[in-house]
């Protein structure tokens, strides 16, 4: 009998293909929600993962068996220093019916953020003297006129923002991360005025999110390197007896010799994949790091020195990794108030 008598489901999820390394450490969301807000606002933010802790809080989920009672809740800590918008990008529909960038406008105030030259080296030529700064204004001044004249064609606006890792000594990093964040709410004219008003200014996470709401988390998972089919796809290990002389931690066959099916489990890269986790609740947004720093600091990170947030449960990624926070595209529930926290664990994480 060369075949199996019992059927079993196919191992591995097709929704997670291809299982390859992410091309960028801080990915940009591919989908943005539509919010009903009269005032424009950013639809995302960027933070850096610190570690995990736990709190006791009053359960306020409706229809929960423990509603109104004190419950234990594991939380993930993220350090979220202010971000700085540097440029405005306008998207319009092209001949193929797809939105593409028609132009981008860089504010002269963006040159005050000196760390931008660590990411965009060509900008250092605009910082030599006043004459070079005037060339910068002349170069991008016409871009703003182009945006205003094509306002009826524009589908949406996005801001190119930079993080400030210099404010987090635990990272040991000075080069800012650049990422696009879409503007939602309001009309196109109001969105343009909002973007021009915030260019070159710091934006706090409190200007984007509030305590208690649900958000989505986009990032890159921990890298595991090269792995076999047992760990990579949870394939059932073959029996270990004398006739299985070619190994047990492998698949029985790859298929006919004409070619390997794409869904056949094979060894390869595991981890460091781009993933999105939906509906993570913000438990707390705080400005006082003493409220969350444990004795001795967080393992492999140190102490928090800036604004921080607590997210319900665990999230992807390793410590010190940039994490993109986005407005929930399909929130399961809309909370009106922030949860009531009764206790925050500040004991040492070092054993």
From Swiss-Prot:
One of its GO terms (cellular component) is cytosolic large ribosomal subunit. Disulfide bonds: none annotated. Keywords: Ribonucleoprotein, Ribosomal protein, RNA-binding, rRNA-binding. PROSITE patterns: RIBOSOMAL_L3 (PS00474). Residues 1-31, 246-271 are annotated as: Disordered. Belongs to the universal ribosomal protein uL3 family. Part of the 50S ribosomal subunit. Forms a cluster with proteins L14 and L24e. This is Large ribosomal subunit protein uL3. It comes from Saccharolobus islandicus (strain M.14.25 / Kamchatka #1) (Sulfolobus islandicus).
